[in-house]
């Protein structure tokens, strides 16, 4: 799904680094997969993959399964990790993350 945008080896390393429950930190993950240095267009493509229901927003249920976009066997985020992730990205407080909010969070 991320071919041409992100390297498989970077994704594998990033997933390995957050295997333990409670260890996911979005900023570290974005850096490890190489997303921080990508263009706005590439970040938008990644957002489109994570936005499973194509609502133009990433909601809490999609964030919970965030890692599974990168590997089907990856774990779901814990409720605490999901809440922290949502709070970090939801700058306007509407309970979901839009593409501009996602891009701002990636660039951190």
Curated annotation (Swiss-Prot):
The keyword Magnesium does not apply. One of its GO terms (molecular function) is calcium ion binding. Keywords: Acetylation, Allergen, Calcium, Metal-binding, Muscle protein, Repeat. It holds the Pfam family EF-hand_7. It comes from the Eukaryota. This is Parvalbumin beta 2. Ca(2+) 2 binds at residues 90, 92, 94, 96, 101. Transmembrane segments: none annotated. Residues 38-73, 77-108 form the EF-hand domain. The modification N-acetylalanine is found at residue 1. PROSITE patterns: EF_HAND_1, EF_HAND_2. Is regarded as an important allergen. On the 2D-gel the determined pI of this protein is: 4.23, its MW is: 11.35 kDa. In muscle, parvalbumin is thought to be involved in relaxation after contraction. It binds two calcium ions. Belongs to the parvalbumin family. The keyword tRNA-binding does not apply. InterPro entries: EF-hand-dom_pair, EF_Hand_1_Ca_BS, EF_hand_dom, Parvalbumin. GO terms for cellular component: cytoplasm.
């Amino acid at each position: 799904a991320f071919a041409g945008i992100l390297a498989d080896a970077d994704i594998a390393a990033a997933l390995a680094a957050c295997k333990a429950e409670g260890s996911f930190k979005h900023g570290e993950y974005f850096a490890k997969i190489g997303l921080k240095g990508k263009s706005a267009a590439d970040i938008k493509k990644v957002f489109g993959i994570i936005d499973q229901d194509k609502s133009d927003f990433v909601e809490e249920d999609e964030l919970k399964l965030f890692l599974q976009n990168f590997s089907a066997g990856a774990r779901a985020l814990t409720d605490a990790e999901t809440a922290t992730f949502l709070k970090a990205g939801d700058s306007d407080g509407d309970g979901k993350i839009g593409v501009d909010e996602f891009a701002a969070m990636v660039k951190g």
